[in-house]
Amino acid sequence: MATVSMRDMLKAGVHFGHQTRYWNPKMKPFIFGARNKVHIINLEKTVPMFNDALAEINKIAARKGKVLFVGTKRAASESVKESAISCDQYYVNNRWLGGMLTNWKTVRQSIKRLKELEIQSADGTFEKLTKKEALMRTREMEKLEKSLGGIKNMGGLPDAMFVIDADHEHIAIKEANNLGIPVFSIVDTNSNPDGVDFVIPGNDDAIRSIQLYTGAVAQTVTEARNQDIVVQAEQDGFVAEA
């Protein structure tokens, strides 16, 4: 299982919070102090909290649970997508559409439409249409892909949600809370930790910090899945004795 050290976090700038005037008092237990009017996060708290979160994600992934990565702001968007794809999981990195989880039935219809359009695009159907109609369908497909592409193969609700920036993604967190889906989130000094099951106090703006978080989660999921495959193979008698 991936673990992250204090050195890794210092190098990535995880300890830099927001300006002191923007702080959320609920984050006080995780703040070490302030420097140049910027809060410094106490990494002695963050390191074990993040590693505890990774241990729990490891358990979920080992039993084939689905992990949804959520990070829609510009700094997080690319890392969230890359990390989710690298471990064969799911992501929302453009805009959280209200009801994405709580109104899954409707979302499923939109995903079905997206897949229909993808088939039409691939099998030459678009070429048989008028230019205008083909353009309209292409635009519809691109729009759906942008908002739902990361969850089109999820096949149901996720078993865990990993979030970058609890404040920015508060709607997603609320939906997960309503459905009893555990929430793992990076929570900066200006954010409200309420509704987050596994709080990870840390910088949620620096790209290097975000890459550290998403990369560690992706590695944890991959290793848990691989371990599960090995165990299954041993049970089925497919692993040769060394």
From Swiss-Prot:
User: GO terms for molecular function, please?
Assistant: structural constituent of ribosome
Q: So which domain of life are we looking at?
A: Bacteria
The record, for InterPro entries, names: Ribosomal_uS2 (IPR001865), Ribosomal_uS2_bac/mit/plastid (IPR005706), Ribosomal_uS2_CS (IPR018130), Ribosomal_uS2_flav_dom_sf (IPR023591)
CDD domains assigned to the protein according to its UniProt record, in alphabetical order: RPS2
A GO CC annotation given for this chain: cytosolic small ribosomal subunit
Record keywords, A-Z: Ribonucleoprotein, Ribosomal protein
Instruction: Report whether Ribonucleoprotein shows up as a keyword of the record.
Output: yes
Give the record's GO biological process terms. translation
> Family assignment?
Belongs to the universal ribosomal protein uS2 family.
Looking up HAMAP family in the UniProt record yields: Ribosomal_uS2_B (MF_00291_B)
The record, for PANTHER family, names: 30S RIBOSOMAL PROTEIN S2 PROKARYOTIC AND ORGANELLAR (PTHR12534), SMALL RIBOSOMAL SUBUNIT PROTEIN US2M (PTHR12534:SF0)
Mind telling me what this protein is named? Small ribosomal subunit protein uS2
Tell me which species this is from: Photobacterium profundum (strain SS9)
